[in-house]
Amino acid sequence: MTYVVTDECVKCKYTDCVEVCPVDCFYEGEFMLVINPDECIDCGVCVPDCPIDAIKPESPELIEWVERAKDFIENHGWKNITKKKCALPGADKFKDEKDKFNKYIIKKT
């Protein structure tokens, strides 16, 4: 099992979670973060540090997010992130929007 970053992170990219991760398993794209499922130790330390509740435990309904994370890291060159950065501009405006992955990531690729 692993933890996954979900749709809530898109266009917000708060990075509070990355500094508490004991194994540095977060990776960064232009609009969101992902957790490398091969590196995550399932400790859950990052969950309470996400201000928008974007980090969830792996479950059957979230398996597509695990696969997306692997794809972004392996095939799109997303880089490891270990230090907190400022959230994306306008993050507060986007934090409650739904279906952001399809609107901003799928549309862009």
Swiss-Prot record:
<dbReference type="InterPro" id="IPR054829">
    <property type="entry name" value="FdxA"/>
</dbReference>
<comment type="function">
    <text>Ferredoxins are iron-sulfur proteins that transfer electrons in a wide variety of metabolic reactions.</text>
</comment>
<keyword id="KW-0004">4Fe-4S</keyword>
<keyword id="KW-0411">Iron-sulfur</keyword>
<dbReference type="InterPro" id="IPR050294">
    <property type="entry name" value="RnfB_subfamily"/>
</dbReference>
<protein>
    <recommendedName>
        <fullName>Ferredoxin</fullName>
    </recommendedName>
</protein>
<keyword id="KW-0408">Iron</keyword>
<feature type="binding site">
    <location>
        <position position="9"/>
    </location>
    <ligand>
        <name>[3Fe-4S] cluster</name>
    </ligand>
</feature>
<feature type="binding site">
    <location>
        <position position="21"/>
    </location>
    <ligand>
        <name>[4Fe-4S] cluster</name>
    </ligand>
</feature>
<feature type="binding site">
    <location>
        <position position="40"/>
    </location>
    <ligand>
        <name>[4Fe-4S] cluster</name>
    </ligand>
</feature>
<keyword id="KW-0249">Electron transport</keyword>
<feature type="domain" description="4Fe-4S ferredoxin-type 2">
    <location>
        <begin position="31"/>
        <end position="60"/>
    </location>
</feature>
<dbReference type="Pfam" id="PF00037">
    <property type="entry name" value="Fer4"/>
</dbReference>
<feature type="domain" description="4Fe-4S ferredoxin-type 1">
    <location>
        <begin position="2"/>
        <end position="30"/>
    </location>
</feature>
<keyword id="KW-0003">3Fe-4S</keyword>
<keyword id="KW-0813">Transport</keyword>
<dbReference type="Pfam" id="PF11953">
    <property type="entry name" value="DUF3470"/>
</dbReference>
<dbReference type="InterPro" id="IPR017896">
    <property type="entry name" value="4Fe4S_Fe-S-bd"/>
</dbReference>
<dbReference type="InterPro" id="IPR000813">
    <property type="entry name" value="7Fe_ferredoxin"/>
</dbReference>
<dbReference type="GO" id="GO:0051539">
    <property type="term" value="F:4 iron, 4 sulfur cluster binding"/>
</dbReference>
<feature type="binding site">
    <location>
        <position position="50"/>
    </location>
    <ligand>
        <name>[3Fe-4S] cluster</name>
    </ligand>
</feature>
<keyword id="KW-0479">Metal-binding</keyword>
<feature type="binding site">
    <location>
        <position position="17"/>
    </location>
    <ligand>
        <name>[3Fe-4S] cluster</name>
    </ligand>
</feature>
<feature type="binding site">
    <location>
        <position position="43"/>
    </location>
    <ligand>
        <name>[4Fe-4S] cluster</name>
    </ligand>
</feature>
<keyword id="KW-0677">Repeat</keyword>
<dbReference type="InterPro" id="IPR022569">
    <property type="entry name" value="Fd_C"/>
</dbReference>
<dbReference type="InterPro" id="IPR017900">
    <property type="entry name" value="4Fe4S_Fe_S_CS"/>
</dbReference>
<dbReference type="GO" id="GO:0051538">
    <property type="term" value="F:3 iron, 4 sulfur cluster binding"/>
</dbReference>
<dbReference type="GO" id="GO:0009055">
    <property type="term" value="F:electron transfer activity"/>
</dbReference>
<feature type="binding site">
    <location>
        <position position="46"/>
    </location>
    <ligand>
        <name>[4Fe-4S] cluster</name>
    </ligand>
</feature>
<dbReference type="GO" id="GO:0046872">
    <property type="term" value="F:metal ion binding"/>
</dbReference>
